[in-house]
């Protein structure tokens, strides 16, 4: 795959079954590794082996400096295994910029009869800085009335051991209005020096 403004992780398998309401929880808290984004121009590929195992990787650079001496590239690799009721994905990324940073991330899921649990953990190691970590855990209930219910908890960012940790909590309910339209009301609380609380309704369409 080659594309402009295309995420490297677009070819990743991942192992997060959680339907996130807020952006940070969208990759089970591993948005810099398993959910690696783009620097501009991206080349990536993946290969799925028999038995549920897959490998993927890619590189992304700014359009004006592809692999140039002035370093502003991103590189990532992912290995994943998925089965009928569980999965796990491990990813590494190296992101260059003002501060070069490497990330390791792991996310996984397990489906019970009544719910699916998803979890993720990520480490962040900036050059010359302290190692930071973050985590996520969420539950998805696929049959609650006519829709699905999701509830999750995550650190609001990756934190060093000396940092004050803040957490984000969310809950949402997604239900189809018809074959092409889904409504998702949700609520979230994001801790900080001043806590933020919000309620929103998202509408998605498929054609």
What is each model feature region?
Residues 175, 195-207:
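Outer-membrane beta-barrel "beta-signal"
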Residues 1-62, 71-73, 80-87, 138-143, ...:
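Outer membrane beta-barrel
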Residues 31-33, 67, 78, 127, ...:
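Outer-membrane beta-barrel proteins
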């Amino acid at each position: 795959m080659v594309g402009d403004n295309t995420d490297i992780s677009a070819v990743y398998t991942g192992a997060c079954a959680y339907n996130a309401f807020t952006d940070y929880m969208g990759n089970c808290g591993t948005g810099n590794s398993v959910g690696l984004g783009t620097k501009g121009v991206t080349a990536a590929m993946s290969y799925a082996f028999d038995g549920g195992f897959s490998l993927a990787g890619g590189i992304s650079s700014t359009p004006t400096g592809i692999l140039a001496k002035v370093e502003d590239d991103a590189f990532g690799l992912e290995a994943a295994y998925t089965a009928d009721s569980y999965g796990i994905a491990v990813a590494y990324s190296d992101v260059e910029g003002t501060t070069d940073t490497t990330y390791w991330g792991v996310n996984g899921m397990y489906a019970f009869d009544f719910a699916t649990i998803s979890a993720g953990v990520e480490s962040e190691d900036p050059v010359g800085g302290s190692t930071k970590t973050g985590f996520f855990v969420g539950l998805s209930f696929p049959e609650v009335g006519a829709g699905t219910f999701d509830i999750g908890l995550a650190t609001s960012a990756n934190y060093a051991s000396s940092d004050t940790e803040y957490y984000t909590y969310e809950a949402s309910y997604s239900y189809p209005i018809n074959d092409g339209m889904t409504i998702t009301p949700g609520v979230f609380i994001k801790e900080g020096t001043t806590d933020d609380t919000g309620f929103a309704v998202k509408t998605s369409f498929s054609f």
